[in-house]
Amino acid sequence: MELIQDISRPPLEYVKGVPLIKYFAEALGPLQSFQARPDDLLISTYPKSGTTWVSQILDMIYQGGDLEKCHRAPIFMRVPFLEFKVPGIPSGMETLKNTPAPRLLKTHLPLALLPQTLLDQKVKVVYVARNAKDVAVSYYHFYHMAKVYPHPGTWESFLEKFMAGEVSYGSWYQHVQEWWELSRTHPVLYLFYEDMKENPKREIQKILEFVGRSLPEETVDLMVEHTSFKEMKKNPMTNYTTVRREFMDHSISPFMRKGMAGDWKTTFTVAQNERFDADYAKKMAGCSLSFRSEL
């Protein structure tokens, strides 16, 4: 029980103006010694935007579609999470030491906190963006079950914090826009969660082309099936059920909850939706990004 008391619900800490989980903020110092390699591939997302999904797709690509190899370890061991650090579990940097090249890496960090070495080495990036309303709802449920986060409070208060960028990793609006801008000068494949839901095979083909690999069509079809939400939700190597309960309590909300586009409509009130839309229009003014909030 002592460990639970030790880790449970610490307040966010600000680093360069960005709020972060306390333990992740502590990882940023050691992360400065990280050395990227030109053959690394970085998976970047704002939280709750399809990170685990695209991680599993890329690991399958790197393993040539071999399902057995993809069952070698949980996804967070196969794709090291750069800024990850909580008591009693190997940190992202520690996991990285045992990861053979070519490495898949994961981050949610905004550019202000990203290790410069990743940009200097021109590391390829697969970025996935998801519509803000579904992210907010999914993040709210995740805050409830992941005990390294502060308690989210009511949905209404959490939504206000989300809109103000006062949740872990800060502003969704800034995150999606700055990585979009980076794609003009850096090798970034910018994908949309909704496109992946609509036509996963098409999006997997884009990823294959981006990483310079090819697989037989029947292998790609197998990947589409194996990386479907239904399959990943029941796969202990992707659904985070191997994580100890004092960190993630799946009885509160499963890590893989619904995996759909448009679920926000079951949560937002009409008034919240109108307020959100007005605020969204201001924050995204002048940005060429376009999101679909349902399919």
UniProtKB/Swiss-Prot annotation:
Record-annotated disulphide pairs: none
Ligand binding (3'-phosphoadenylyl sulfate): 48-53, 130, 138, 193, 227-232, 255-259
GO CC entries: cytoplasm; cytosol
Active site feature: H108 (proton acceptor)
Listed EC numbers: 2.8.2.1
Record's subunit section: Homodimer.
Chain's role: Sulfotransferase that utilizes 3'-phospho-5'-adenylyl sulfate (PAPS) as sulfonate donor to catalyze the sulfate conjugation of catecholamines, phenolic drugs and neurotransmitters. Is also responsible for the sulfonation and activation of minoxidil. Mediates the metabolic activation of carcinogenic N-hydroxyarylamines to DNA binding products and could so participate as modulating factor of cancer risk.
Protein name, UniProt field: Sulfotransferase 1A2
Species of the source: Homo sapiens (Human)
